[in-house]
A protein has these predicted regions:
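Conserved acidic catalytic loop of the alpha/beta-hydrolase fold
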Residues: 142-166
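Active-site glycine-rich loops that stabilize anionic/oxyanionic intermediates
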Residues: 91-94
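Alpha/beta-hydrolase fold catalytic core
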Residues: 1-86, 111-114, 336, 351-352, ...
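Conserved serine/cysteine hydrolase catalytic core
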Residues: 269-308
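Conserved alpha/beta-hydrolase catalytic His-Asp/Glu region
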Residues: 206-207, 226-285
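Conserved alpha/beta-hydrolase
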Residues: 110-129
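Catalytic histidine-centered segment of alpha/beta-hydrolase-like enzymes
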Residues: 325-345
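Flexible "cap/lid" loop of the alpha/beta hydrolase fold
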Residues: 185, 194-224
Length: 372
């Protein structure tokens, strides 16, 4: 069979392939070092990517809709011949699994999309080389540069000679949502990229939460150097994770607790401090294809301060959704039936927003920019 998307040969080199959590979807997982070893990603390019981000490795998965199990020899063309990709970017102490059914729901809603869920910024299986990385290596602007480089590495943008229009749709939560504000529109073509920020922890105008993240990050970082304080951590950890994952499913709560335990304390502490001390206002005022969703009971992202910041950034009011819910407004927990009902509705809104953004971007590419 002729591979029309030979630049995406890495798709065939999955570590594992399985049925997805959502019916009629499939998932394949990838590790950059494994793809380099197999010759499916050029070794020098892969190593340059890791070196620029200070990472030991990079881990991701893809989710696609299918009514049957596509044979391996057809997989590259199947994943390449689409209208776009949805890149899911988790928050602190998260990993690519915190999204649960959301990637599958999106690709089932718009079957010309493929979802890519990543581990990033030192979490999951994308660990930093340095167990206590410098803050400028793990703050939102640095994470956005890594995302941009990753997209270029796996070549999912429209390549020279391709006839189809493609859109890259970013979806970020918490730290991942803040990351999306630092996208450089100069690196993208007209209508090529969209952004959906869920509970973005962008704290430029929120002094109380800045202090919270900075202090928490400093405290966790100290545990890396003074293990004797782990007794204190046993009392702090349950409270912190109750706050972070309030309203989320038990699975998400367990994932965060396990990820916290598995991640070097220096990495977790640095990621938190980087959000707390961030003072970078170099944010392009280009929000036509960006949406923000905020939860009214989010203890980690202050609603009033975030709305003030969005106003200062001249973010369009019509592109903001405030929904009844917590920091994890898209995860359906079992704490109360009312909370589960509200989060279920918010999750449906997230799916609709992602698909609508994608379709608007496609329309913009086909029509072209208006001049004059």
């Amino acid at each position: 069979m002729i591979e029309r998307y030979s630049h995406m040969r890495w798709v065939s080199g999955y570590l594992e392939r399985r049925a997805g959590d959502v019916p009629n979807t499939y998932v394949a997982e990838y590790q950059l070092s494994d793809l380099m070893r197999k010759g499916l990603i050029e070794r020098n390019a892969g190593q340059d990517f890791l070196n620029s981000a200070g990472l030991l490795d990079f881990h991701w998965s893809i989710t696609w809709p299918e009514d049957f199990d596509v044979p391996d020899e057809m997989l590259v063309n199947r994943i390449g011949d689409v209208a776009g990709y949805v890149v899911f970017v988790h928050g602190w102490t998260g990993n690519m699994h915190i999204w649960e059914e959301l990637p599958g729901m999106v690709v089932n809603k718009q079957r010309q999309l493929v979802a890519i869920s990543i581990d990033h910024n030192g979490f999951g299986k994308s660990l930093f080389e340095d167990k206590t990385p410098p803050l400028q290596s793990c703050n939102p602007p640095a994470a956005m540069r890594t995302l941009q480089n990753f997209i270029e590495l796996i070549k999912i943008r429209r390549q020279r000679g391709e006839t189809r229009t493609k859109v890259i749709n970013f979806v970020g939560h918490s730290m991942g949502g803040a990351t999306l504000f630092y996208m450089n529109p100069m690196l993208w073509n007209y209508g090529e990229v969209t952004r959906m920020a869920l509970a973005p922890a962008l704290l430029l105008e929120d002094e109380s939460h800045r202090v919270f993240y900075t202090t928490l990050g400093l405290g966790i970082g100290i545990l890396q150097r003074l293990p004797v304080l782990e007794l204190v951590e046993r009392f702090i950890k349950p409270s912190v994770f109750r706050t972070l994952t309030a309203g989320a499913s038990d699975r998400v709560k367990d994932l965060h607790a396990a990820q916290y335990s598995d991640t070097p304390k220096g990495i977790t502490g640095a990621a938190l401090m980087a959000m707390g001390v961030l003072n970078d206002y170099e944010i392009a005022r280009d929000f036509t294809l960006m949406r923000v969703m905020l939860g009214h009971r989010d203890p980690l992202v202050g609603l009033v301060n975030m709305m003030d910041l969005l106003g200062d950034l001249e973010f369009p009011a019509k592109n903001i959704h405030v929904v009844p819910g917590t920091h994890y407004m898209f995860s359906i927990g079992s704490e109360t039936p009312a909370n589960a009902y509200l989060h279920a509705q918010a999750r449906e809104m997230v799916v609709e927003d992602i698909v609508n953004l994608h379709e608007e971007a496609m329309r913009m590419q086909k029509v072209g920019p208006r001049i004059g």
